[in-house]
Amino acid sequence: MFKREEIIEMANKDFEKAWIETKDLIKAKKINESYPRIKPVFGKTHPVNDTIENLRQAYLRMGFEEYINPVIVDERDIYKQFGPEAMAVLDRCFYLAGLPRPDVGLSDEKISQIEKLGIKVSEHKESLQKILHGYKKGTLDGDDLVLEISNALEISSEMGLKILEDVFPEFKDLTAVSSKLTLRSHMTSGWFLTVSDLMNKKPLPFKLFSIDRCFRREQKEDKSHLMTYHSASCAIAGEGVDINDGKAIAEGLLSQFGFTNFKFIPDEKKSKYYTPETQTEVYAYHPKLKEWLEVATFGVYSPVALSKYGIDVPVMNLGLGVERLAMISGNFADVREMVYPQFYEHKLNDRNVASMVKLDKVPVMDEIYDLTKELIESCVKNKDLKSPCELAIEKTFSFGKTKKNVKINIFEKEEGKNLLGPSILNEIYVYDGNVIGIPESFDGVKEEFKDFLEKGKSEGVATGIRYIDALCFKITSKLEEAFVSNTTEFKVKVPIVRSLSDINLKIDDIALKQIMSKNKVIDVRGPVFLNVEVKIE
């Protein structure tokens, strides 16, 4: 906390001095907690749900009302809608199945088996029979069966489960039996039901839309087909409705997603629930992609199918696949990867990778941590001293009840060199998935590497960590370890850097895995010629 009164008094006496000196009150974050190792965290929406919401708003802007159509459809409705084509259509439908409820009696043999488990049945026989009978009749849910058996016999639920497994094997041998109910394979099967019920409840004309999941029994899933998908469908019912309404709706809807220019091409499929010569494919031009894309289908429902539902006015239906539109909008190549990204490779961008490059060892004690900054500044200032030369830094620390006098000596004994090597100010960058050390100046860099390094510096993400920074933290971290272990001296020698660990750096395994799998590189090679002796008294 700031001592506000002292600061105000200091500022009143000498504002400039107070302004400069109080900067030390703003403590910088530790290096592993500084940018770009910290990054903003945002929630992330799913592209399919984004597209659904955009489609909802687009339909609402066009005056449509939103409805939810039935997901479970009786196969009789498929026959009513498709006529003789129904059998072929039902082949792509999922049928709902359920386990039958076995007629389980409480015979003398089963009573004997229960009693062998140490449970007295005689007092509870009638209660147990009622439970088994209730399950058979459907008045007791299956997920309550174990609990009710346990309560009836006054035993634990674990023992109740054992009875169900050991005494009533009939439950384990059950096989699902298919019903006549199907999961909606396309939105049309629901529209007939909805429009039929609204005919005597809403004035004509009316415009409805629904965006919901459909299920299709594809032979296999591939980059453009899933067994479950979302349909964004609408229906317009009223006198005078025809395919021209479909064209206008297609243009109005899709123009809100960046499409321009539309082609309406007769669909060769000719589904029997559409009036002949009305089933139409919509192709739209996308200026960004510079392509014509098939994006929707519409048609006018057949009077034959409509009449079976008591609908006596034309109904135009338009539908499009949400996933298809999301793929176009997001430039995805594979619907599986777009819908289920968690099952596919996650690509880290350069910013992500940069946040995963950190110092391996950092001192914990504030005094020693602060020494690092002084050490870095001295090294940078004196890096070009001509050898033989040395740089000495002395400090006294309080460690527990003792005083520690520390002398750090950085030296170069060999003649004709500098105190520190030419790569000492190299900085770690992430560029195009690579982790590279880039020099402060490109003087003397070979032409074959120069272009890549220049691009890395201008287009890559800087980590803000230079070799000298990381190495100085290595020195002070070892100093802290020496305090703890009561060591009196140690040396640090790093002549040539070949890997991140040589300069006290590490990278997250997730980033490392991507670098290796994508044939990217970690190249931090360079001469630093660091020689350090530390003595502690």
UniProtKB/Swiss-Prot annotation:
One example of the protein's molecular function in GO is: phosphoserine-tRNA(Cys) ligase activity
Q: What is its EC number?
A: 6.1.1.27
Give me any GO biological process, just one: tRNA aminoacylation
The disulfide bridges present are none
Signal peptide as annotated in the record? none
What does it catalyze?
tRNA(Cys) + O-phospho-L-serine + ATP = O-phospho-L-seryl-tRNA(Cys) + AMP + diphosphate
Q: Which UniProt keywords apply?
A: Aminoacyl-tRNA synthetase, ATP-binding, Ligase, Nucleotide-binding, Protein biosynthesis
Tagged with keyword Zinc: no
- Residues bound to substrate are 186-188, 231-233, 273-274, 317
Q: Which domain of life is it from?
A: Archaea
Q: Summarize subunit and interaction data from the UniProt record for this chain.
A: Homotetramer. Interacts with SepCysS.
NCBIfam families attached to this UniProt entry = sepS
Return the similarity comment: Belongs to the class-II aminoacyl-tRNA synthetase family. O-phosphoseryl-tRNA(Cys) synthetase subfamily.
Question: What's the protein here called?
Answer: O-phosphoserine--tRNA(Cys) ligase
Recorded name of the encoding gene: sepS
